[in-house]
């Protein structure tokens, strides 16, 4: 079975063939650490975490090198530090730690490499020097700019003529530019901003050159997969291609380009500038990370995803159903010889079709339920293993089923519930139905839902 990827550059679905199966390389644009990331920022984190898991499954865990950068020099970071009156490192350390905390809670594996822009200034200056020497960049008024007209393939990735790209994007107009689309590689720092010495004067790098330099140092001049949000196609990724190809005189930066769609609210793109953002750092206080992850994977990654409270509710119900099946099968060990269902693998191999993949989970959970009712331990073991393997491929079903349903219940409450359930069992055995109903009422008052089944009663906290 071959993994197929929709390549943004060629506009078609292609068989994935790594340049070196023993070193599969992927790069995803990471955070600018000046504030908490919003839920739209985490869509690529979760989507391409699934890609990372699938590649590890196909080629081996040690064969996949996944780099996700950290932008830790930026105007917004400088402004945040100035507003709070603290060093820049306080801001970047705080929000990078929060980003890691949130990504972990959403079930994203840590990337193999996490290069920071400030740790690659030497590599950035080296690449800028190559571009100037090649005639692809020029110095002007303390700046160094990329000459877009020197690169014949500029615009190929986004598939739009240069004039159209300029009209549809925020392009800085400056008198020192040879062409309006020329972009900054190096610029002078303002007072109290971080700066580094360079052949063109003290300053700091532009955003686009950071990624090109970090890709080169972390992964090489040509990589297998470059991924990110669709909004990065132009100008960021277009500019990366131009810089990297001109600096190295190569024909390809990435063999496959992948872009996830926008996350919308009421049909409008979610963004901090519009003020319509959901912050996972806050949402995670009330919502399990797996629920948020399920919601983020509920639409195909290339399609827009409309974020609503109903989406989270449905995601919670879906996971409750799956965890419920695992809970009822908890006394049977999974059959380690079993693999994820073919339907799940087939869906993932078709350009990461996560909605189709997760829909196949429910057939397996139903098989578990039937096997539990029939007392068929062989079928329970086989299907439990298949469901857990499928979950591992997509980052789901990583919690203990009992803990999933008990939620944030304290140890004291858990003990109280178990005591009441034991008394209810005794009352039912004695056919004292009024006492059993009264106990159920006490449990309801505690916010506990009791579920009777063939293996006895289980419970969960109310949503």
From Swiss-Prot:
Motif 'HIGH' region, residue range(s) on this chain: 31-41
GO process terms (BP): cysteinyl-tRNA aminoacylation
EC category: ligase
A GO cellular component annotation in the UniProt record: cytosol
Enzyme Commission number(s): 6.1.1.16
Cofactor binding summary note: Binds 1 zinc ion per subunit.
Positions contributing to ATP binding: 272
GO molecular function, one term: cysteine-tRNA ligase activity
InterPro entries: Cys-tRNA-ligase, Cys-tRNA-synt_Ia_DALR, Cys-tRNA/MSH_ligase, CysS_C, Rossmann-like_a/b/a_fold, tRNA-synt_1_cat_dom, tRNAsynth_Ia_anticodon-bd
Cofactors that this protein relies on: Zn(2+)
Sequence positions that bind Zn(2+): 29, 211, 236, 240
Keywords: Aminoacyl-tRNA synthetase, ATP-binding, Cytoplasm, Ligase, Metal-binding, Nucleotide-binding, Protein biosynthesis, Zinc
Catalytic activity: tRNA(Cys) + L-cysteine + ATP = L-cysteinyl-tRNA(Cys) + AMP + diphosphate
The organism's place on the tree of life at top rank: Bacteria
Chain location of the short sequence motif 'KMSKS' region per the record: 269-273
Subcellular location: Cytoplasm
UniProt main location, coarse: cytoplasm
Assembly mode: Monomer.
Family, per entry: Belongs to the class-I aminoacyl-tRNA synthetase family.
Protein name per the record: Cysteine--tRNA ligase
Recorded name of the encoding gene: cysS
């Amino acid at each position: 079975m071959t993994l197929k990827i929709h390549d943004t550059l060629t506009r078609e679905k292609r068989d994935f063939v790594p340049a070196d199966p023993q070193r599969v390389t992927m790069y995803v644009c990471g955070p600018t650490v000046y504030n908490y990331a919003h839920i739209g920022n985490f869509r690529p984190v979760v989507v391409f975490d699934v890609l990372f898991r699938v590649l590890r499954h196909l080629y081996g865990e040690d064969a996949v090198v996944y780099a996700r950068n950290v932008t830790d020099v930026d105007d917004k970071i400088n402004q945040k530090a100035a507003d709070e009156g603290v060093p820049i490192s306080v801001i970047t350390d705080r929000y990078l730690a929060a980003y890691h905390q949130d990504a972990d809670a959403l079930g994203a594996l840590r990337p193999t490499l996490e290069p920071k822009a400030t740790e690659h200034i030497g590599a950035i200056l080296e690449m800028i020097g190559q571009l100037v020497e090649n005639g692809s960049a020029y110095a002007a008024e303390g700046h160094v700019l990329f000459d877009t007209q020197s690169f014949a393939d500029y615009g190929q990735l986004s598939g739009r003529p240069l004039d159209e790209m300029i009209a549809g994007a925020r392009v800085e107009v400056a008198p020192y530019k040879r062409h309006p689309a020329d972009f900054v590689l190096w610029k002078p720092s303002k007072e109290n901003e971080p700066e580094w010495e360079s052949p063109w004067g003290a300053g700091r790098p532009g955003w686009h050159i950071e990624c090109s330099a970090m890709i080169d140092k972390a992964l090489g001049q040509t990589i297998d997969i470059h991924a990110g949000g669709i909004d990065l196609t132009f100008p960021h990724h277009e500019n990366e291609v131009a810089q990297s190809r001109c600096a190295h005189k190569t024909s390809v930066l990435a063999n496959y380009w992948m872009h996830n769609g926008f996350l919308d609210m009421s049909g409008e793109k979610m963004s901090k500038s519009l003020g319509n953002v959901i912050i996972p750092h806050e949402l995670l206080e009330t919502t399990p990370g797996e629920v948020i992850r399920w919601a983020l994977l509920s639409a195909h990654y290339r399609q827009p995803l409309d974020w609503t409270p109903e989406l989270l509710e449905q995601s919670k119900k879906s996971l409750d159903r799956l965890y419920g099946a695992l809970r009822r099968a908890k006394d049977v060990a999974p059959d380690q010889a079993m693999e994820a269902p073919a339907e799940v693998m087939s869906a993932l191999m078709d350009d990461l079709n996560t909605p189709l993949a997760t829909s196949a989970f429910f057939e397996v959970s139903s098989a578990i339920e039937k096997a539990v009712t029939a007392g068929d331990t062989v079928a329970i073991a086989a299907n439990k293993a298949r469901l857990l393997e499928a979950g591992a491929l997509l980052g789901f079903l990583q919690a203990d089923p009992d803990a999933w349903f008990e939620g944030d219940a304290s140890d004291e409450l858990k003990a109280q519930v178990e005591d009441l359930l034991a008394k209810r069992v005794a009352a039912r055995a004695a056919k004292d139905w009024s006492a059993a109903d009264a106990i159920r009422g006490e449990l309801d008052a505690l916010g506990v839902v009791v579920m009777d089944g063939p293996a006895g009663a289980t419970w969960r906290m109310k949503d």
